């Protein structure tokens, strides 16, 4: 029996990154030997065991054979004669097909070290094309390591295109698509994930609402980058700098979906694209089974992002109504989330990346003023039933009006 550290732990250690999870491959053993040594078996489809002390995963070396469609259509074979090289060959990328023995020596049968040095994401073998999930995984790795200068090898991107055109991605379940997307949204450069999907044709298959934005022009005066698809990825990049929250990043990604519905004869203007985009947000989220909280914020951002940008022109009643519409009284975090997504929208434009965004500050300040109006004082004043709500709203409007007069500049 020989045990090797494999995969991401080896890769990230070589890149000088922190290692979170460690996976091990066991060569020359059997399930019974593992059980006799005190390991606990957890894998149903193939033998995976938990170490009795560390609870890290130890998998018997195995090979895989395509036996059906999609990413689940594989038959696994494991036996003591399966070699380490056999096991590593089934992995997706060469940089993930590295192993380390107990002496610290790196085993590299597929030139993963060379590709690490050259910052290349390259598939190990043609078997890559048998698993459509790998298209998303490579896009996610490209996003995860973009800051280190990684790029996808030309032959791997070509294979990803062939897989997409062959309809392989249609076998992916919504849950797996969302899981990979959610992971990509946590990376430093989530926009790279969607750009890679577009480069291989997968964006049109998995995110048609986003793909439809490319080639749709916006007024050059407000959007020097012109293309709405490019603007969308720029805003996502900016959102990633402003917030680590997946819901903020996803909502930013979806903020302009309504522009994809504008008839070409009306370009480059997109009047009413915010409310129009709400249905597309709902459509996308329902298809991918996006969690409700993330979906709800994306809907609100699509509907109200343009309104927040015009904050100095809003009257106090509209401002308080906005807080009502986003349910800020029960979910105050939404004010900050909308401020961040709106800022990402404004700064996600060519030449505006470092622009100040006072509207975000005013939105936050206006909220602090409105929510500081005490409900208790209204009740003690003798108001009852529905009158309490009406009087509280009136006092909030008055407070916001007073604040706005002093702090928020009047529009020209």
From Swiss-Prot:
Disulfide bonds: none
Residues at which ATP binds: 8, 11, 91, 137, 140
HD domain: residues covered: 228-329
Residue positions binding Mg(2+): 21, 23
Catalytic activity: a tRNA precursor + 2 CTP + ATP = a tRNA with a 3' CCA end + 3 diphosphate; a tRNA with a 3' CCA end + 2 CTP + ATP = a tRNA with a 3' CCACCA end + 3 diphosphate
Cofactor(s) needed by this chain: Mg(2+); Ni(2+)
Listed GO biological process terms: RNA repair; tRNA 3'-terminal CCA addition
Cofactor note: Magnesium is required for nucleotidyltransferase activity. Nickel for phosphatase activity.
Top-level taxon: Bacteria
Keyword Flavoprotein carried by entry: no
Annotated binding of CTP, by residue: 8, 11, 91, 137, 140
Family matches, as SUPFAM superfamilies: Nucleotidyltransferase (SSF81301), Poly A polymerase C-terminal region-like (SSF81891)
E.C. number(s) listed in UniProt: 2.7.7.72, 3.1.3.-, 3.1.4.-
GO MF entries: ATP binding; CCA tRNA nucleotidyltransferase activity; cyclic-nucleotide phosphodiesterase activity; magnesium ion binding; phosphatase activity; tRNA binding
Protein keywords: ATP-binding, Hydrolase, Magnesium, Metal-binding, Multifunctional enzyme, Nickel, Nucleotide-binding, Nucleotidyltransferase, RNA repair, RNA-binding, Transferase, tRNA processing
Subunit structure of this chain's protein: Monomer. Can also form homodimers and oligomers.
Miscellaneous remark of the record: A single active site specifically recognizes both ATP and CTP and is responsible for their addition.
Function per UniProt: Catalyzes the addition and repair of the essential 3'-terminal CCA sequence in tRNAs without using a nucleic acid template. Adds these three nucleotides in the order of C, C, and A to the tRNA nucleotide-73, using CTP and ATP as substrates and producing inorganic pyrophosphate. tRNA 3'-terminal CCA addition is required both for tRNA processing and repair. Also involved in tRNA surveillance by mediating tandem CCA addition to generate a CCACCA at the 3' terminus of unstable tRNAs. While stable tRNAs receive only 3'-terminal CCA, unstable tRNAs are marked with CCACCA and rapidly degraded.
Protein name (database record): Multifunctional CCA protein
Gene name of this polypeptide: cca
């Amino acid at each position: 029996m020989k045990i090797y550290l494999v995969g991401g732990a080896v890769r990230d250690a070589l890149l000088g990154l922190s290692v979170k999870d460690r996976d091990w491959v066991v060569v020359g053993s059997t399930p019974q030997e593992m059980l006799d040594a005190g390991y606990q078996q957890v894998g149903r489809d193939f033998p995976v065991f938990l170490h009795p002390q560390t609870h890290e995963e130890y998998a018997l070396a195995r090979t895989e054979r395509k036996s059906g469609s999609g990413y689940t259509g594989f038959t696994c074979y494991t036996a003591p004669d399966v070699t380490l090289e056999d096991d590593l060959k089934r992995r997706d990328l060469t940089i993930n097909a590295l192993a380390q023995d107990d002496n610290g020596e790196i085993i590299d049968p597929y030139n993963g070290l060379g590709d690490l040095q050259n910052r290349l994401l390259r598939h190990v073998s043609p078997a890559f094309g048998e698993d459509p999930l790998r298209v998303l995984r490579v896009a996610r790795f490209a996003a995860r390591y973009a800051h280190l200068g990684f790029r996808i090898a030309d032959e791997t991107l070509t294979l990803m295109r062939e897989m997409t055109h062959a309809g392989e991605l249609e076998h992916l379940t919504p849950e797996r698509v969302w899981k990979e997307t959610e992971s990509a949204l946590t990376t430093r450069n989530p926009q790279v994930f969607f750009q890679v999907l577009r480069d291989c044709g997968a964006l049109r298959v998995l995110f048609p609402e986003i793909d439809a934005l490319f080639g749709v022009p916006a007024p050059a005066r407000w959007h020097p980058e012109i293309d709405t698809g490019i603007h969308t990825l720029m805003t996502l990049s900016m959102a990633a700098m402003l917030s680590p929250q997946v819901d903020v990043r996803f909502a930013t990604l979806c903020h302009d979906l309504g522009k994809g519905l504008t008839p070409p004869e009306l370009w480059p203007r997109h009047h009413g694209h915010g409310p129009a985009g709400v249905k597309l947000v709902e459509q996308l989220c329902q298809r991918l089974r996006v969690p409700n909280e993330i979906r709800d914020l994306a809907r609100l951002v699509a509907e109200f992002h343009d309104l927040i940008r015009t904050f100095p022109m809003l009257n106090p009643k509209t401002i308080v109504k906005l807080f009502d519409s986003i349910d800020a009284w029960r979910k105050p975090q939404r004010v900050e989330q909308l401020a961040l997504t709106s800022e990402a929208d404004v700064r996600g434009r060519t030449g505006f990346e470092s622009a100040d965004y006072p509207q975000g500050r005013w939105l936050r300040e206006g909220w602090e003023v409105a929510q500081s109006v005490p409900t208790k004082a209204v009740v003690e004043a003798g108001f009852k039933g529905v009158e309490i709500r009406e009087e509280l709203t009136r006092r909030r409007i008055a407070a916001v009006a007073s604040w706005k007069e002093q702090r928020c500049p009047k529009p020209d």
